[in-house]
C-alpha cells in the first residue's frame, strides 16, 4: 500500500543541467536548436536510405536504424526539459521519472549494440569480402537489430523495477535535467547495495558492445595493413572513420559518467550527460553524411524529388 501511495503522490524536482537560472536559460535555447536539428537530420538520413535503392545494403540498413534510435533517444528527455522550462516548472511524477529512466537505459543500450553491429559489418566487409553477402544477409541484419532492441530492453527492465521498489523519504531533487539511475539511487533512503551492484552489472553489459567494436577494428586494421598499397589503408579509414568518430564521442562521454563510484556523482556531471543525450545524436547525421558520397548523393536526390514535386 505504501509503494502504491508513493507512486501516485511522489514527485521529483529536476534541477537541470547546472541548477543556475541564467545558465539554464542558455541550455534551454541550446536545446531549442539542438532538438529540431536532431529530428530533421536523422529523419533525412532514414528517408535518403529508404528512397535510394543503391543504399539498400547492410551498412546503410544499420545506419538507418541508428538514426531512428537517436530520434527516440533525444525525444525521451529534451521535450520534457523544454516544456518544464517554458512552464516554469521543474517537477516530474514518479511514474514519469521511471518511464524516462527505462527508455534512456533501453535506448542507450540499443544504440551501443547497433554501433557494435556496424563495426562487425565493416570488419566482415574488409576482412572477408568474398563471404560478405552470405554473412551479412538481410536475415542476419534483422537479427542484429532485433537482438539490439531485446538486449536494450532486457537491461532496462530490472533497473526500472528495482528503482520502483525504493523508498524516497527526504530530498527529492534530482541532480540532472532528466531522471537518471545514478542520482535516483543517491536520493533513496532504502538499502541500495544490491541496486548498486545491479547498476554496475548493467554497466558491464553496456561495455560488451565496446569490446566487440575493439575486436572488430583490430580485425579491420590487421587486414588493411597487410595490403601493400596505401589505397587499402585510405579506403578503410574512409569507410570506418565516421563510425570511429561516433563511437569515440558516445563511449567517451558515457564512460566518463558511469565508469566510476556512485559517491563521486554530483550536479556538475549533468553537463556530461548533455553530450551523449543531445549533442551526439545531433552530430551523427553530419558525421556520417559529410564524409560519405553515397549518402550525400541520396540526400541530393531526395531534395530534388521534393523540389520537382
Curated annotation (Swiss-Prot):
Extracellular face of the membrane: 1-25, 80-100, 159-195, 259-270
Higher taxonomy: Eukaryota, Metazoa, Chordata, Craniata, Vertebrata
Organism: Pan troglodytes
GO terms of biological process kind: signal transduction
Keyword Transmembrane helix: yes
Gene: OR1A1
Superkingdom in the source lineage: Eukaryota
Protein name per the record: Olfactory receptor 1A1
Annotated membrane topology: Multi-pass membrane protein
GO annotations of cellular component type: plasma membrane
Amino acid at each position: 500500500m505504501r509503494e502504491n501511495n508513493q507512486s501516485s503522490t511522489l514527485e521529483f524536482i529536476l534541477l537541470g543541467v547546472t541548477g543556475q537560472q541564467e545558465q539554464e536559460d542558455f541550455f534551454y535555447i541550446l536545446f531549442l536548436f539542438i532538438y529540431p536539428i536532431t529530428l530533421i537530420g536523422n529523419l533525412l538520413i532514414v528517408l535518403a536510405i529508404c528512397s535510394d535503392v543503391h543504399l539498400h545494403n547492410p551498412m546503410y540498413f544499420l545506419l538507418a536504424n541508428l538514426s531512428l534510435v537517436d530520434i527516440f533517444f533525444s525525444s525521451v528527455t529534451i521535450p520534457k526539459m523544454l516544456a518544464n522550462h517554458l512552464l516554469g516548472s521543474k517537477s516530474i511524477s514518479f511514474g514519469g521519472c521511471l518511464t524516462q529512466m527505462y527508455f534512456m537505459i533501453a535506448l542507450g543500450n540499443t544504440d551501443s549494440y547497433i554501433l557494435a553491429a556496424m563495426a562487425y559489418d565493416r570488419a566482415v566487409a574488409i576482412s572477408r569480402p568474398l563471404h560478405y553477402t552470405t554473412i551479412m544477409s538481410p536475415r542476419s541484419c534483422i537479427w542484429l537489430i532485433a537482438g539490439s532492441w531485446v538486449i536494450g530492453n532486457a537491461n532496462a527492465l530490472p533497473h526500472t523495477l528495482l528503482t520502483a521498489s525504493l523508498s524516497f523519504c527526504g530530498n527529492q531533487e534530482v541532480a540532472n535535467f532528466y531522471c537518471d539511475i545514478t542520482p535516483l539511487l543517491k536520493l533513496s533512503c532504502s538499502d541500495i547495495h544490491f541496486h548498486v551492484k545491479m547498476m554496475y552489472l548493467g554497466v558491464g553489459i553496456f561495455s560488451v558492445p565496446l569490446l566487440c567494436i575493439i575486436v572488430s577494428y583490430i580485425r579491420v586494421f590487421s587486414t588493411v595493413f597487410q595490403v601493400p598499397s596505401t589505397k587499402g589503408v585510405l579506403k578503410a579509414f574512409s569507410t570506418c572513420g565516421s563510425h570511429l568518430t561516433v563511437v569515440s564521442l558516445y563511449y567517451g562521454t558515457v564512460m566518463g559518467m558511469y565508469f566510476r563510484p556512485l559517491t563521486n556523482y554530483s550536479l556538475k556531471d549533468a553537463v556530461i550527460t548533455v553530450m551523449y543525450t543531445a549533442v551526439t545524436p545531433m552530430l551523427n547525421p553530419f558525421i556520417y553524411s559529410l564524409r560519405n558520397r553515397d549518402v550525400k548523393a541520396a540526400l541530393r536526390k531526395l531534395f530534388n524529388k521534393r523540389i520537382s514535386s
